[in-house]
Amino acid sequence: MRSAVSNLRFALCTVSLAILCCGCAAYRFGTASLYPPDIHTVFVPMFESDSLRRNLSERLTEAVVKEIELKTPYKVVSEPDADSVLTGRILNDIKRVVVEDPYDQQRENEITIIAEVSWVNRRGDLIGSRGNVPIPEALVQLSGTGVAVPEFGQSIATGQQQAIDRMAEKIVSLMETPW
């Protein structure tokens, strides 16, 4: 009687373990699971810019490349035959006064950069489209905002760099695979 109960427990444990392993077979572990496994290299051409501010597209491209190298398993390459291509265009940059003193002197400025990005694979198919978020086109619009307070020695360039860094973080976060 005792061996029959032991055999039944052993069989149940074995079946449970097999079901558990089969159910978790599609999961990946670690930070590599955040990114598509079939992509290893990314080509990031210079972002285009509709802005009249100088060097804005160069600075954003550089920030995106650094962010990709820092936070993803991808290698940024300089050739267009990479596994994927991340393109972008700066649509607008806006500087507005947030706080003024009683004499109409600027005390705080807000700099916003608006861009659209597209990440496609070698065949031209969109990568990383969000399953829950309906995106009708291959382009995703993002914005990054920075603040400059002249009283603290911050210039407009400081606010622009803050907006560029935030924009680069958002662009790279789009490269993550949705849950």
What are these regions (language model features)?
Residues 1-13:
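Bacterial N-terminal signal peptides that target proteins for export
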Residues 10, 30-38, 58, 89, ...:
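Membrane-targeting and insertion segments and their boundary/processing signals
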Residues 11-23:
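Bacterial N-terminal signal peptides
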Residues 13, 33, 77, 104-106:
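Residues embedded in well-ordered secondary-structure elements
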Residues 18, 47-48, 56-63, 84-92, ...:
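N-terminal start-of-chain detector that recognizes signal peptides
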Residues 22-66, 70-81, 125, 164, ...:
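A structural "domain/chain start" motif
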Residues 48-54, 150-160:
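Second-shell loop/turn segments in exported
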Residues 70-74, 85-155, 165:
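Surface-exposed short loop/turn segments
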